Amino acid sequence: MIDKTAVIHPSSIVEEGAVIGAGVHIGPFCFVGSQVEIGAGTELKSHVVVNGITKIGCDNQIYQFASIGEANQDLKYAGEPTRVEIGDRNRIRESVSIHRGTVQGGGLSKVGSDNLLMINAHIAHDCIIGDRCILANNATLGGHVEIDDFAIIGGMTAIHQFCVIGAHVMVGGCSGVAQDVPPFVIAQGNHATPFGINIEGLKRRGFDKESLHAIRNAYKLLYRSGRTLDEVKPEIAELADQHPAVQAFIDFFARSTRGIIR
């Protein structure tokens, strides 16, 4: 179904069965598959491919040569009907690729809302991206990676399969991330190591001085006390009881499967 207010360039192909919302603009030489749903106000600039079982929300801007919903590169993938979901108000720049999920990984690759995916970023199968994240040029995510809200991934950075990147993290450019990065942390290098707390980012997002001080103290326990994670967890949990912002560390530790960067 194509809404009567949608504008589709005559050189583009929209297969029968696709759902195209109000005010959608599909520019020249695009392809939209039969199982695709595109929400109101979204624009495909030109030469964009959206295929597979893919649902795109409202008011997204998708630039030239982006490829969304194509088959993933997992060697186990046998054409199962897996999906891609994208939220609202994302900017998906030139040549970004977002692959559909795998059955083994839950069948879904998901991007939230208000994200900026810069030129040539790659989101592999079963990745889960939160809201208000930035993936800079040529950032590459392996399969099953999770990126929490407000994280920034620098250009030319590669993230290993199954890694979790916490909220408000900043990973510097040209890094290789092979383990999980706790929330609020700045990480850099190959293999990435911690370089303190993303204080400026947290200030911009409204964290008060007391919360920032508590987050710093949690970081010091984690990285500067010379003790193991299991040894410092109880003290960080005590901090979290007094300062709710620190609870993000405790919740993150419970999710981590690859261990945290050191």
UniProtKB/Swiss-Prot annotation:
Pathway: Glycolipid biosynthesis; lipid IV(A) biosynthesis; lipid IV(A) from (3R)-3-hydroxytetradecanoyl-[acyl-carrier-protein] and UDP-N-acetyl-alpha-D-glucosamine: step 1/6. It catalyses: a (3R)-hydroxyacyl-[ACP] + UDP-N-acetyl-alpha-D-glucosamine = a UDP-3-O-[(3R)-3-hydroxyacyl]-N-acetyl-alpha-D-glucosamine + holo-[ACP]. One of its GO terms (cellular component) is cytoplasm. CDD domains: LbH_UDP-GlcNAc_AT. Pfam families: Acetyltransf_11, Hexapep. GO terms for biological process: lipid A biosynthetic process. Transmembrane segments: none annotated. It is an enzyme of class 2 (transferase). One of its GO terms (molecular function) is acyl-[acyl-carrier-protein]-UDP-N-acetylglucosamine O-acyltransferase activity. Its EC number is 2.3.1.129. Keywords: Acyltransferase, Cytoplasm, Lipid A biosynthesis, Lipid biosynthesis, Lipid metabolism, Repeat, Transferase. It is found in: Cytoplasm. Its main location: cytoplasm. InterPro entries: Acetyltransf_C, Acetyltransf_C_sf, Hexapep, Hexapep_transf_CS, Lipid_A_LpxA, Trimer_LpxA-like_sf. The keyword Acyltransferase applies. Belongs to the transferase hexapeptide repeat family. LpxA subfamily. Involved in the biosynthesis of lipid A, a phosphorylated glycolipid that anchors the lipopolysaccharide to the outer membrane of the cell. Homotrimer. This is Acyl-[acyl-carrier-protein]--UDP-N-acetylglucosamine O-acyltransferase. It comes from Yersinia enterocolitica. The gene is lpxA.
